[in-house]
A protein has these predicted regions:
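Nucleotide-activated donor-binding/catalytic signature segment of Leloir-type glycosyltransferases, i.e.
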Residues: 230, 238-257
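Short alpha-helical donor nucleotide-sugar binding micro-motif in glycosyltransferases
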Residues: 264-269
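Short hydrophobic beta-strand element within catalytic cores of glycosyltransferases
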Residues: 294-297
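Donor nucleotide-sugar binding/catalytic pocket of nucleotide-sugar-dependent glycosyltransferases
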Residues: 132-186
Length: 361
């Protein structure tokens, strides 16, 4: 039983459905942070496991067909993995509910692996979802620009009956608001030559570029140590196997670790490297930099809007990465300030977005 004051407080709370159709690591951290931080909101969270990507992005309205709450929300916050247009079509009661469509990524700038077949379907899901939403929110400017450019390219390929100013209309209702990070503990006694890899060992992170640069560095006689973290398949990925075979004496840790150990190794690392060919916000690098690791990232994707020239190298260039690593190992620049991505700096911005007082456009 609720006391009258408690019941009034619950009734005064805004009810938001948080729909996340692909609970991967970064999507999960975002959803958990929102629901645990913005407690003045009455959250109703629906999520689907982060696997079977093609099925998830097209099948989520079917998976949720009989699972939506009976109470209609004040607002829907949906990730761009949600097939929003179909969801609204299947549930007419949601027709006039305002929706914020949040882009952790976009399918127009996502590199296909050799195991995937090309399909325009995921792009169309996000295009229709963006049109159906009241507001679009991106975690970086790169994410927004690549999405809008991708739509222009797609629409120019269509034979006829294409409406005018689609990208202009979408841009006018868009904004940038990053995923917040929790700063990691910063240790003063860092290992001066410890290089960190804290990304997934998958094709879109291009780990083979990292490995080849390390081997070149080793052949030059440069001393370094390695902390190899991040998710990996049960079968050791080829790039990781190559490191184990050629640089086993350099490795101090080689596993996906729990949160406590993750923070420990981030705080000990001096340099954190990315070789990604796909990155929309780069949370792993931001976390490491918050622990005062110095970033070394491609001059591409979201990185130019985050890090100065000194921290960047020519994309996919093994020699450039090797040279910059050698330079950083001899004299490591101070890590840049990333505090404007911290939870305490972004909480009010998220609160303002979700507690709007005027109709969304």
């Amino acid at each position: 039983m609720f006391f009258p004051t408690e019941l009034m407080r619950m009734q005064s709370k805004q009810t938001i459905w948080l729909l996340s159709a692909y609970r991967s690591q970064s999507h999960a951290a975002w959803a958990d942070w929102l629901t645990q931080t913005l407690t003045e909101i009455n959250w109703c969270t629906l999520e689907l496991p982060g696997r079977h990507f093609r099925w998830r992005i097209r099948g989520n309205p079917l998976s949720w067909l009989h699972k939506l709450p009976e109470e209609t929300p004040d607002l829907i916050l949906a990730t761009s993995m949600v097939d929003l247009a179909t969801l609204k079509g299947l549930h007419p009661r949601l027709a006039n509910i305002p929706v914020i469509y949040y882009f952790h990524e976009n399918q127009f700038a996502y590199p296909a692996s050799k195991q995937q077949h090309d399909s325009v379907d995921p792009q169309m899901v996000q295009l229709y979802g963006a049109i159906a939403a009241n507001r679009l929110v991106f975690n970086s400017n790169y994410n927004r620009q690549s999405f809008l450019s991708g739509i222009d390219k797609l629409l120019n390929m269509l034979p006829d009956e294409v409406p005018n100013n689609v990208t202009g209309d979408l841009k006018s209702k868009s904004q940038i608001l990053p995923v917040a990070i929790k700063p990691m503990q910063n240790k003063q006694n860092k290992i001066s030559n410890l290089i960190l890899w804290n990304h997934r060992w998958e094709y879109d992170k291009a780990p083979e570029v990292f490995v080849d640069a390390l081997i070149k560095l080793n052949n030059k006689g440069i001393d370094f140590k390695l902390a190899l973290l991040g998710e990996r398949a049960k079968k050791t990925p080829p790039a990781l196997l190559k490191i184990e075979n050629n640089l086993h004496d350099k490795i101090i840790i080689n596993e996906k670790v729990n949160s406590e150990k993750y923070q420990h190794y981030l705080s000990q690392s001096s340099i954190v490297v990315s070789t990604a060919i796909h990155e929309f916000q780069g949370l792993a690098i931001l976390e490491a930099v918050s622990a005062s690791a110095t970033p070394l990232v491609p001059d591409d994707l979201c990185y130019p809007e985050q890090y100065a020239d000194i921290y960047r190298y020519r994309p996919n260039d093994r020699d450039a990465l090797t040279e910059k690593l050698q330079l950083f190992l001899s004299s490591t620049p101070a890590a840049p300030d990333v505090s404007h991505w911290y939870s305490d700096k972004l909480k009010n911005k998220w609160n303002t977005l979700l507690n709007f007082t005027a109709p969304l456009t």
